[in-house]
């Protein structure tokens, strides 16, 4: 039993009769906790903690449910994601392509002209029973007149014929920088857009599509915060979304913070916006704000993840490793020197050990000139990080945030680099053993989903969402250790490890009551977990199941045709398994090209079952059909 002080009989909230994972030093479980003024004041058994209650105290019987500290997403494009959330149909966690296409069909019927239907990139073709993505023929049949954009992770996107017409794409349209428009034998764009290797080329294709109004962006941000609460996320570190202008594009989240209506705590980084003028960009941010500006719900934290355009170490494993330019060191040193001088924490996207070594050369040189002296900094991702560079990061006081990219791209990594290299990609256990701060984040929302239980599943099971084994037992984490990475571990990256990430007296009363017992259920069921009761700052922000009567009101979704207004349209495995399997069989059988006439695909073996593909390879010579679907012309 843990108890702070003798009770003052004045708790605002007491939850009891639960299985509460405190994440204290001993990893203790308790049955009850008490909250006062947004902070935990006591934890322990029911009898002792209920002594903190009086007639004014709200008491919630947990009925034996499991409680965890609110999850902290250490790498989320929360502010940018909030601005577009109401526009996006999500296929995250849907078990079959047939069901995904059913949702698409329903949304097409609901979407008025000239709006587009957009599927965000947080899904994998290999999560589907059919082991393939949609064909362009399927998209055109579903939406002959409505523009449809379907993004697959950060590697590719499908645009149906209506989208190509809306964009004015034809045989004279050049390939976008950093990408490729697949073409038919006559040079016409087929509708398949490939990131080669920059995923920004995918989202840029949507720039001409209608955007939300200011009022709808505000609503969209509210709905996204609630969606995060529904999966137990109570805090996020915003990694500095590309394309955002500070402070203009932060208006929605700042308005909600000013009104006291944010339900997810956000510490945000600011990134470079102009290639070749990054020092000027950061000098501007330094003049406008400073780390710590804001409050407990919204504040400036630091710089990144884009510190330098030429230092973007992309991780599309369908493409070769990015070769960074020789000018990188001098240019990056100028940026880091400015940040260290002004004591701005910073983060940098880094996939490959070769790049990480060069980045560390710069950091070590700057540190000799201007000591970091406790300044917090980190790398994001680090799939191929070596033991030698783990030691160098530790020596400079840095940390690493990992994202479940291997859960979605593990098969691609294995195809390019081999199963042996994949066994420690990223080397989470080695980083923890070296004493490195390690946090977990989603990388959402454009190229990844926001469900933290996918990351927990990946760290515990060592498997991809498609079921491919990636890691041996010695490289996997236990459930408590994985949870610690996604709570206390992540809190370190915003200097909040003494306020968040554990349920002990004095810390924020941020916690989630789970739909099932994370510590006991079959590991394969972890991605289906959600929160039935989420509390932030001692207040209920989400409630479901037996706690539904406690749910606070949420504004109606706007616009009314938003996918978010359609129950289930934001993803999740809420389909009946038998029906999903039946629809999957039918969908797999329909995988052959449906394009008629002389422009038909004519690819050998086209009618085969897509599920036979061991791994989808977009560039296989002489074979344009794979698990991502048919590459046939969209016209």
Please identify what each model-predicted range represents.
Residues 258-263, 292-293, 366-374:
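Short helix-capping segments at alpha-helix termini
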Residues 1-10:
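Bacterial Sec-dependent signal peptides at the C-terminal "C-region" and cleavage site
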Residues 491-493, 499, 513-526, 532-535, ...:
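C-terminal functional module detector
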Residues 337-347, 351-377, 381-382, 387-391, ...:
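His/Asp/Glu-enriched, well-ordered alpha-helical/loop segment
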Residues 291-293, 394-397:
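Structural alpha-helical segments in enzyme catalytic/regulatory domains
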Residues 11, 31, 499-502, 531:
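Short, conserved secondary-structure segments in the cores of folded domains
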Residues 9-16, 21, 25-286, 299-355, ...:
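Divalent metal-binding segments
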């Amino acid at each position: 039993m843990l108890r702070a002080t003798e009770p003052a009989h004045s708790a605002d909230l007491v939850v009891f009769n639960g299985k509460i994972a405190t994440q204290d030093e001993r990893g203790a479980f308790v049955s009850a906790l008490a909250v006062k003024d947004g902070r935990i004041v006591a934890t322990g058994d029911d009898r002792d903690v209920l002594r903190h209650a009086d007639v004014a105290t709200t008491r919630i019987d947990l009925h034996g449910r499991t409680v965890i500290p609110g999850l902290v997403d250490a790498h989320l494009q929360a502010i940018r994601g909030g601005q577009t959330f109401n526009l996006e149909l999500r296929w995250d966690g849907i078990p079959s392509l047939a069901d995904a296409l059913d949702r698409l069909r329903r949304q097409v019927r609901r979407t008025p002209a000239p709006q587009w239907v957009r599927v965000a990139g947080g899904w994998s073709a290999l999560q589907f029973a059919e082991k393939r993505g949609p064909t362009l023929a399927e998209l055109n049949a579903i939406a002959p007149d409505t523009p449809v954009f379907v993004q697959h992770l950060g590697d590719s996107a499908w645009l149906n014929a209506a989208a190509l017409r809306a964009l004015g794409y034809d045989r004279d349209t050049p390939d976008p920088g950093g990408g490729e428009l697949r073409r038919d034998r006559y040079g016409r764009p087929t509708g398949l857009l490939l990131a080669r290797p920059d995923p920004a080329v995918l989202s840029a294709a949507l720039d001409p599509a209608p955007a939300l109004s200011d009022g709808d962006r505000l609503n969209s941000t509210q709905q996204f915060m609630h969606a995060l609460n529904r999966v137990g996320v109570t805090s996020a570190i915003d990694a500095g979304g590309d394309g955002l202008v500070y402070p203009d594009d932060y208006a929605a989240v700042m308005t909600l913070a000013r009104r006291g209506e944010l339900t997810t705590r956000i510490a945000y980084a600011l990134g470079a916006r102009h290639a070749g003028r990054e020092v000027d960009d950061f000098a501007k941010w330094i003049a406008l704000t400073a780390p710590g500006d804001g409050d407990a719900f919204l504040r400036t934290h630091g710089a990144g993840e884009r510190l330098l355009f030429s230092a973007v170490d992309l991780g599309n494993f369908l493409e070769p490793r990015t070769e960074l330019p020789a000018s990188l060191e001098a240019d990056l040193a100028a940026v880091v020197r400015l940040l260290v001088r002004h004591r701005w924490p910073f983060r940098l996207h880094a996939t490959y050990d070769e790049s990480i070594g060069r980045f560390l050369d710069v950091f070590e040189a700057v540190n000799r000139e201007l000591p970091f002296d406790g300044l917090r900094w980190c790398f994001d991702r680090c799939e191929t990080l070596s033991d030698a560079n783990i030691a160098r990061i530790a020596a400079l006081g840095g940390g690493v945030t990992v994202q479940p990219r291997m859960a979605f791209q593990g098969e691609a990594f294995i195809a390019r680099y081999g199963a042996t290299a994949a066994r420690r990609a990223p080397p989470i256990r080695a980083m923890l053993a070296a004493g490195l701060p390690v946090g977990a984040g989603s990388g959402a929302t454009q190229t990844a989903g926001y469900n933290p239980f996918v990351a927990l599943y990946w760290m515990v099971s060592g498997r991809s969402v498609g079921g491919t084994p990636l890691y041996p037992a010695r490289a996997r984490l236990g459930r408590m250790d994985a949870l610690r990475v996604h709570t206390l571990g992540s809190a370190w990256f915003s200097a909040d490890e003494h306020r968040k990430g554990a349920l002990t007296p004095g810390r924020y009363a941020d916690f989630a009551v789970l739909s099932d017992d994370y510590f006991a259920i079959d590991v394969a069921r972890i991605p289906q977990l959600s929160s039935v009761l989420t509390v932030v700052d001692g207040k209920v922000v989400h409630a479901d199941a037996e706690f539904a009567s406690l749910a606070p009101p949420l504004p109606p979704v706007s616009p009314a045709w938003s996918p978010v207004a359609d129950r289930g349209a934001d993803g999740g495995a809420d389909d009946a398994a038998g029906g999903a399997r039946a629809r999957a069989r039918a969908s797999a059988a329909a995988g052959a090209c449906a394009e008629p006439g002389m422009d038909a695909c004519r690819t050998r073996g086209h009618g085969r079952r897509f599920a036979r593909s061991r791994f989808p390879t977009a560039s296989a010579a002489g074979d344009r059909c794979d698990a991502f679907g048919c590459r046939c012309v969209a016209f």
